[in-house]
Design a protein with these regions (language model features):
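Active-site neighborhood of glycoside hydrolase catalytic domains
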Residues: 183-194
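Proline-centered turn/helix-capping motifs that create local helix->coil transitions or kinks
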Residues: 31-36, 151-163
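A structural signal for well-ordered alpha-helices, especially hydrophobic packing surfaces
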Residues: 27, 147-151, 192
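Low-complexity, Ser/Thr/Pro/Gly-enriched N-terminal "stalk/linker" regions
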Residues: 1-55, 75-78, 82
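Aromatic-rich carbohydrate-recognition surfaces in CAZymes
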Residues: 53-159, 181-185
Length: 194
């Protein structure tokens, strides 16, 4: 696959070791170039649904936490960098983009397209695994502008954030008429602490 081996684990239960090794193999089929629709290591880490190539903020952030362990076989920050490249003048970074058109995917349940603001948490993890100080210097202005947009758009007088419930991506936990969702406000706190 690539020039580096994936990290090896030694565990008394061989079935777990086999699953671990197979997981790295399965990941290869999820690195897709949306323009050519080919599976390539330099593509984006996505799972096409119904022929649509959608990059999701929450999935991209969470995937960076395990991709850092691939010994650079996979780029842990490529998906995140895509979101940074789409930052608007206002500071907005939308939660989903169509990779073929580059356009944000917005709907009536989340007209601003805000996702859980956890980019700083992901960057904190990336820094602790790679010690890339240059990256911190490069992304800090993006993250600051993003948080300024979140404050200006969703922060209320009481200090809490009133984002749409769908921004949490917890569709299996519906909450009608929620105003200050704890998951979104907790994500803001986690993001601010990193």
């Amino acid at each position: 696959m690539n020039k580096h081996d994936f990290p090896k684990i030694h565990f008394y239960e061989q079935d777990f070791v086999d699953i671990y090794n197979k997981t790295w193999t399965w990941l290869y089929s999820s690195w897709i170039d949306p323009k050519t629709e080919e599976t390539i290591p330099d593509g984006y880490f996505i799972h096409p649904t119904n022929g649509n190539y959608v990059i999701d903020q929450f999935e991209s952030i969470l995937s960076s936490f395990f991709l850092v362990y691939s010994n650079r076989n996979y780029d842990a920050n490529k998906n995140i960098d895509y979101f940074y490249s789409k930052q608007e003048e206002s500071g907005a970074i939308r939660w989903r983009y169509d990779l073929k058109t580059g356009q944000p995917i917005l709907d009536s349940s989340n007209p601003e397209g805000v996702g859980l603001p956890l980019f700083a948490w992901a960057e904190f993890n990336l820094y602790h695994k790679s010690a890339n100080k240059r990256r911190i210097k490069d992304v800090m202005p993006i993250l600051q502008k993003y948080m300024e947009w979140i404050d200006a758009t969703f922060k209320q007088e009481n200090g809490l954030y009133a984002a749409p419930a769908s921004a949490s991506t917890m569709f299996n936990s519906p909450r009608d008429n929620v105003r200050y969702a704890i998951d979104f406000n907790a994500a803001v706190a986690i993001n601010a602490s990193h």
